[in-house]
Design a protein with these regions (language model features):
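Membrane-interface loops
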Residues: 63-77, 107-191, 195, 243-257
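C-terminal membrane module of polytopic membrane proteins
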Residues: 218, 224-257
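Short, intrinsically disordered terminal tails adjacent to the first/last structured region
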Residues: 2, 8-31, 247-257
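N-terminal transmembrane-helix/juxtamembrane module of multi-pass inner/ER membrane proteins
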Residues: 21-99, 147, 156, 255-257
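Hydrophobic, membrane-inserted alpha-helices
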Residues: 97-102, 179-182, 203-210
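Interfacial helix-loop-helix junctions of multi-pass membrane proteins
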Residues: 146, 165-168, 206-232
Length: 257
C-alpha cells in the first residue's frame, strides 16, 4: 500500500514510488548477477553448455533440408523387423536418460567423469553433424498407416510429425544411449549399485531396439552408432586419451619444480 502526505502533489508521490520501484529492480538485478557469478565460480565446467549453440543451429539447419535429395539408408534386415508402437516409451525416455546422467555428473560427479561424458557425447554428435552435412541421408521405412489405434500409435504419429526421416546415420539415439550407460557404469557411486547399473543397461538396449521397431532408423544406422560408440569408449575410457595430455603436463611441471 502506498502512503502519502496530503500536502504532497500527486506527481511527487508518483516520482517517489517510481524511484522505489527502480531501486528495487536494481537490487534484484544485482542479486541475480551475484547468484550467476557464484554459480559459474562453483561450476566452472559449465562452459561446456556453450556446445548447444553449435549443435542446435546446425542440427535444425540440417532438418530444414529434408526436402532435398538424400541417400536412402536401407538393408534387408529392416524389412524383417516389425513395427511395434510400444517401443515409443523407451524411445522417449532417451531424452530424460541422457539428461539425467549429464546433470548427475555435473552436480555430483567428478570433473574428470563429467568431461569424459561430454567428450564422448560431443565428439560423436559433431561427427554426426559433419556426416549429415556432406552425406545427406534418410530412410523410407515408416508405415503409412497403423494396424492399431491407441495412445502409443498416437505418440508415434506425433513423433513422425516432429522428426523428419532424414539425418539418421549414425543413430545419435543409439550413440548417446551407450555414452550415458558407460558414464553411469564408470561413476563410483551409481556404477556400484547393481540395480541402477542393470536398469541402465536394460534401458540402453530398449532404446537401441526402439529405434528400429519404431522405424526411426535402419539397422545400418544402429550398427554405425554402436561402432562409433565402441571407438569412443576405447578412446575415452580404455586408453584415457582425453586426459593423457593433462597428466603429461602435470608431470612436466612437477619435474621442473
Amino acid at each position: 500500500m502506498l502512503y502519502c502526505d496530503p500536502d504532497q502533489k500527486p506527481t511527487e508521490i508518483m516520482m517517489k514510488h517510481e524511484m522505489k520501484l527502480l531501486l528495487s529492480h536494481r537490487y534484484c538485478i544485482k542479486k541475480e548477477d551475484e547468484i550467476m557469478k557464484a554459480f559459474f565460480h562453483k561450476y566452472k565446467h559449465s562452459f561446456v553448455l556453450l556446445y548447444a549453440f553449435i549443435y542446435l543451429p546446425w542440427f535444425f539447419w540440417l532438418e530444414s533440408r529434408a526436402n532435398l535429395p538424400y541417400h536412402v539408408i536401407h538393408v534387408g534386415l529392416d524389412d524383417k523387423i516389425p513395427f511395434v508402437e510400444y517401443f515409443i516409451v523407451p524411445y522417449l525416455l532417451w531424452f530424460a536418460y541422457v539428461a539425467a546422467v549429464f546433470l548427475w555428473l555435473f552436480f555430483r560427479g567428478t570433473k574428470k567423469a563429467f568431461y569424459q561424458y561430454c567428450i564422448f557425447l560431443f565428439t560423436g554428435m559433431t561427427l554426426f553433424l559433419i556426416i549429415s552435412t556432406v552425406f545427406p541421408n534418410g530412410h523410407l521405412l515408416r508405415p503409412t498407416s497403423f494396424e492399431r489405434h491407441n495412445i502409443f500409435t498416437v505418440a508415434v504419429q506425433l513423433l513422425y510429425q516432429a522428426d523428419t526421416p532424414t539425418n539418421i546415420f549414425p543413430s545419435i539415439h543409439v550413440f548417446n544411449s551407450i555414452a550415458a550407460h558407460r558414464a553411469l557404469s564408470n561413476d563410483p557411486k551409481l556404477g556400484q549399485n547393481r540395480l541402477i547399473r542393470g536398469g541402465s543397461f536394460v534401458l540402453m538396449v530398449s532404446i537401441i531396439l526402439a529405434t528400429m521397431f519404431l522405424k526411426q532408423h535402419s539397422a545400418l544406422d544402429v550398427a554405425a552408432g554402436i561402432l562409433l560408440a565402441t571407438l569412443m569408449d576405447q578412446l575415452v575410457y580404455r586408453t584415457d586419451f582425453a586426459f593423457s595430455r593433462e597428466r603429461v603436463s602435470k608431470r612436466n611441471r612437477e619435474t621442473v619444480i
